[in-house]
């Protein structure tokens, strides 16, 4: 499993729109290191995050915050993903708010799932894929 993400040197900077550092992810250690910084799954023109600046992507990221229910029995946990996505390659990284209270919600599993895809340069197709 190989894919690229683009990062900044910042952590938790929600107003940041620049992601100039390309990181090729080849293994768990690469992803762990890169995910420690703010990052995106898309290469953007001039490294500036904007739909109109979309160049390409080879990975789709799904955020799982378990925000739909307060019932722990209904929460999705990383160990459940293999059964949910059989025969699908993916990588999981805990979010920085994993098992912490957030936005008035109790501590719960919060994580990101990275699904490598065939590289696309079609922003509309990529956006549709993310909405599935």
Regions found by a protein language model. Name each.
Residues 1-111, 115-131:
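Signature for HUH/AEP ssDNA processing cores
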């Amino acid at each position: 499993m190989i894919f690229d993400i683009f990062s900044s040197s910042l952590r938790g900077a929600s107003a940041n729109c620049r992601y100039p550092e390309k990181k090729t992810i080849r293994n768990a250690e690469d992803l762990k290191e890169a995910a420690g910084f703010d990052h995106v799954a898309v290469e953007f023109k001039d490294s500036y995050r904007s739909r109109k600046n979309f160049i390409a992507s080879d990975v789709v990221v799904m955020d799982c915050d378990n925000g739909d229910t307060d019932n722990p029995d209904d929460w999705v946990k990383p160990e459940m993903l293999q059964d949910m996505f059989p025969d699908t390659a993916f990588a999981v990284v805990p979010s920085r708010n994993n098992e912490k209270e957030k936005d008035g919600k109790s501590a719960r599993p919060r994580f990101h799932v990275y699904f490598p895809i065939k590289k696309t340069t079609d922003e509309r197709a990529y956006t549709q894929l993310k909405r599935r």
